[in-house]
């Protein structure tokens, strides 16, 4: 009887995966951190501001309970649901200009 009870406890712990928390990259640190309870979705939100042409899109990384919906046009949100799946997006390399480009 004790063996059966112990087996049931072990199976329950394995099946429930007690204490698991999703980890996502979080800005501004861009470090992997555990998400708060109930937030199992990682997101990457990008948008342009007044300096987009100079420094590229702004980026916000974080956790959410569900995939956020953009509140304005021009905001892109990508969601995923595995640990640390919301890496910082790569920016295309800009071309350095020279004095010859500006007569």
Swiss-Prot record:
Cystine connections: 24-42, 35-63, 48-52, 67-79, 80-85
Nucleotide-binding in keyword set: no
GO molecular function: acetylcholine receptor inhibitor activity; ion channel regulator activity; toxin activity
Assigned protein family: Belongs to the three-finger toxin family. Long-chain subfamily. Type II alpha-neurotoxin sub-subfamily.
Segment forming the signal sequence: 1-21
Tissue note: Expressed by the venom gland.
Record keywords: Acetylcholine receptor inhibiting toxin, Disulfide bond, Ion channel impairing toxin, Neurotoxin, Postsynaptic neurotoxin, Secreted, Signal, Toxin
Function: Binds with high affinity to muscular (alpha-1/CHRNA1) and neuronal (alpha-7/CHRNA7) nicotinic acetylcholine receptor (nAChR) and inhibits acetylcholine from binding to the receptor, thereby impairing neuromuscular and neuronal transmission.
UniProt cross-references to Pfam families, sorted A to Z: Toxin_cobra-type
Record-level GO cellular component terms: extracellular region
Major localization listed first in the record, in broad terms: secreted
Record protein name field: Pseudonajatoxin b homolog
Superkingdom of this protein's organism: Eukaryota
Compartment(s) of residence: Secreted
